[in-house]
C-alpha cells in the first residue's frame, strides 16, 4: 500500500473490511435463518458431498442463491439449457480461472465447492478493485477529492451489496466499467474500448457503454472543427465510430453465434449426464439437438431476446401489474435518487444539456464559472447513461433488479449522494483538500478524528441533517436487508 495516497488507502481499507463483514454476516444469516423453498433453478449435485464440502456449503452457501445458481451451473457444466444463455460468459469464465488457482484443493473439495470458494474470493477482489476504480474515476471527473472519496466509500456500503458478494456478475462488471471510464477520461481510447468490450461480455447492458466512446469521439470532432476543415475529422470520426461499435459489440455477437451453432445446427448436441437430462424433462428446459427453437428462423436470430421474452417475460410495461406493487416500492429509492440527480443537473446546466455536452456555454466571451463535484460539466455523459438505464429498466425490466442494475453500472448512484452529503451536511462542509490528502477534522480532546467521512457521520449521527440520515439509512438498510433475505432464498433479487 506504499504506492497509494492516503485517500486510496482509506478506500481500500474500508472496502476490504466491508467485504469481510459481508461474508461473515451472510454465513451467520444463512445459519440461523431457515431457507425459503423458492421456485428457483436448482440443478442436482452430480458429485458426492464430503465433510469439507458441507463446511464450504455452510459457510458460503448464501452466495449461491437465485441467479447465482445459473452462473455456478454454467461454470461447472457449460451452456446446456437454452435459458442458460440469458447469462453472459464473462463471469463463469472468471470462476473457472479461479478454480484453476484452487487446483491443490480439488482432491479435498468437489468442483461446486471450489466454485463457491472462487465466488467468495473473486467477488471480494472485484468489488474492492471497483471501489478503487470508482475513486480514481471520481478524482478525474469531479475534480473534488472529498466528493470522490465519499462516493467510493458509499460504494463499499452499496444498496446492491449482496450482489457484489454473491455469485453474480455485478462486481466484475462494475470493476471493468469504472476502469474503462477512467481510461477514457485519461484519453486512452484503445484501453477503454477493450475494457468496455470485456464488460459487454459480462453483462448485456455493457453494450450501452458504447455511448461513452461515441460521445468522446464526437467531442473530439467538434473541437477539431475550430482548426481544421471538416472532411478529415469527419472521416476520422466515422472510422473510429465503426471501430468502436465493432470492438464493443464483438463479445455479444460471438456469444449469440455460439448459441446459434449449438441450437440451430444439426448434430451439435453435447453429451449430457442423465440427471441433467431428467431435470430438463421435468422442467421443460430445451436442449440442443431437439427441434429447432423458433428464434432460429428469425431474420436476426438472437437467442438473448427470445429468452428474455419467453422465459423471463421481459418487455415494455409487462411488469406493470397490481401484484408487483411491492417490487415497485423496492425500486422507489433508486428511482428517486436518479430522477433527483437528473433534475438537479439539468436545472443547473440547461444549455450544456441542450447541446449534449458538446458546448459548455452559450456565450463563449462570458463563460460561466466552472463547477466542481457532481455539477462538473464532465458529469453530463454519465448522467445521460444513468437516466437511460433507469428509463429502460423501469419500463421494460423486472423493476426489483433496478437497484443492482444501476448500482453496478453508473457512478451517478454514488456521486449524487456524495454531493448531497457534502452540500447538505454541516459536519462535512469545510474547505476542500488537495488531491491525495484526507480531510483533517476537529475532534473532541482525547478522541482520534476518523479519516473516513462516513464513519464520522455514524459517530455524530444525532447531529446529522435529515438528508444525511435519509441517504445513510437507505444505503445501510438495503446493505443489511439484502443479506438477510437473499442469502435465504427470500425475495430479494
UniProtKB/Swiss-Prot annotation:
Record InterPro entries: PIG-V/Gpi18 (IPR007315)
This protein's pathway: Glycolipid biosynthesis; glycosylphosphatidylinositol-anchor biosynthesis
Transmembrane segments: 14-34, 78-98, 114-134, 137-157, 162-182, 193-213, 235-255, 328-348, 379-399, 470-490
Gene Ontology cellular component list: endoplasmic reticulum membrane
Name of the protein: GPI alpha-1,6-mannosyltransferase 2
Keyword Membrane in annotation: yes
Organism, scientific name: Mus musculus
Classification via Pfam families: Mannosyl_trans2 (PF04188)
Amino acid at each position: 500500500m506504499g504506492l497509494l495516497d492516503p485517500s486510496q488507502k482509506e478506500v481500500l481499507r474500508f472496502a476490504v473490511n466491508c467485504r469481510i463483514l459481508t461474508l461473515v454476516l451472510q454465513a451467520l444469516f444463512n445459519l440461523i435463518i431457515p431457507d425459503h423453498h423458492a421456485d428457483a433453478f436448482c440443478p442436482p449435485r452430480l458429485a458426492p458431498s464430503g465433510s469439507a464440502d458441507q463446511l464450504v456449503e455452510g459457510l458460503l452457501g448464501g452466495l449461491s442463491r437465485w441467479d447465482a445458481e445459473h452462473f455456478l451451473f454454467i461454470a461447472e457444466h457449460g451452456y446446456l439449457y437454452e435459458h442458460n444463455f440469458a447469462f453472459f460468459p464473462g463471469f463463469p469464465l472468471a470462476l473457472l480461472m479461479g478454480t484453476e488457482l484452487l487446483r491443490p484443493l480439488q482432491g479435498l473439495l468437489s468442483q461446486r465447492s471450489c466454485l463457491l470458494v472462487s465466488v467468495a474470493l473473486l467477488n471480494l477482489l472485484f468489488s474492492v478493485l471497483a471501489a478503487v476504480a470508482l475513486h480514481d474515476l471520481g478524482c478525474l471527473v469531479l475534480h473534488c477529492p472529498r466528493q470522490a472519496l465519499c462516493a467510493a466509500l458509499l460504494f463499499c456500503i452499496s444498496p446492491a451489496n449482496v450482489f457484489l458478494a454473491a455469485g453474480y456478475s455485478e462486481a466484475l462488471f462494475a470493476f471493468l466499467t469504472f476502469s474503462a471510464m477512467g481510461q477514457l477520461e485519461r484519453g486512452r481510447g484503445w484501453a477503454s474500448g477493450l475494457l468496455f468490450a470485456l464488460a459487454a461480455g459480462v453483462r448485456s447492458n455493457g453494450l450501452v457503454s458504447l455511448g461513452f466512446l461515441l460521445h468522446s469521439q464526437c467531442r473530439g470532432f467538434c473541437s477539431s472543427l475550430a482548426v481544421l476543415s471538416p472532411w478529415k475529422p469527419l472521416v476520422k470520426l466515422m472510422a473510429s465510430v465503426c471501430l468502436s461499435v465493432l470492438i464493443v459489440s464483438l463479445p455479444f455477437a460471438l456469444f449469440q453465434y455460439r448459441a446459434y451453432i449449438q441450437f440451430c445446427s444439426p448434430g451439435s448436441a453435447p453429451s449430457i449426464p442423465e440427471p441433467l437430462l431428467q431435470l430438463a424433462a421435468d422442467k421443460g428446459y430445451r436442449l440442443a439437438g431437439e427441434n429447432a427453437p423458433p428464434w432460429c428462423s428469425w431474420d436476426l436470430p438472437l437467442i438473448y431476446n427470445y429468452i428474455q421474452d419467453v422465459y423471463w417475460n421481459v418487455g415494455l410495461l409487462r411488469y406493470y401489474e397490481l401484484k408487483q406493487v411491492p417490487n415497485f416500492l423496492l425500486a422507489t429509492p433508486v428511482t428517486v435518487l436518479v430522477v433527483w440527480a437528473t433534475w438537479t443537473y439539468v436545472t443547473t446546466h440547461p444549455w450544456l444539456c441542450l447541446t449534449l455536452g458538446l458546448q459548455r456555454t452559450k456565450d463563449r466571451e462570458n463563460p460561466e464559472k466552472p463547477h466542481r463535484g457532481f455539477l462538473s460539466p464532465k458529469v453530463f455523459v454519465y448522467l445521460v447513461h444513468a437516466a437511460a438505464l433507469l428509463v429502460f429498466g423501469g419500463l421494460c425490466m423486472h423493476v426489483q433488479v433496478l437497484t443492482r442494475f444501476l448500482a453496478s453500472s453508473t457512478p451517478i448512484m454514488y456521486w449524487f449522494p456524495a454531493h448531497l452529503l457534502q452540500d447538505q451536511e454541516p459536519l462535512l462542509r469545510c474547505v476542500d483538500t488537495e488531491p491525495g490528502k484526507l480531510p483533517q477534522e476537529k475532534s473532541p480532546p482525547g478522541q482520534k478524528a476518523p479519516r473516513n467521512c462516513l464513519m464520522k457521520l455514524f459517530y455524530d449521527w444525532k447531529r446529522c441533517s435529515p438528508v444525511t440520515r435519509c441517504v445513510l439509512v437507505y444505503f445501510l438498510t438495503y446493505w443489511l436487508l439484502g443479506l438477510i433475505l437473499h442469502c435465504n432464498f427470500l425475495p430479494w433479487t
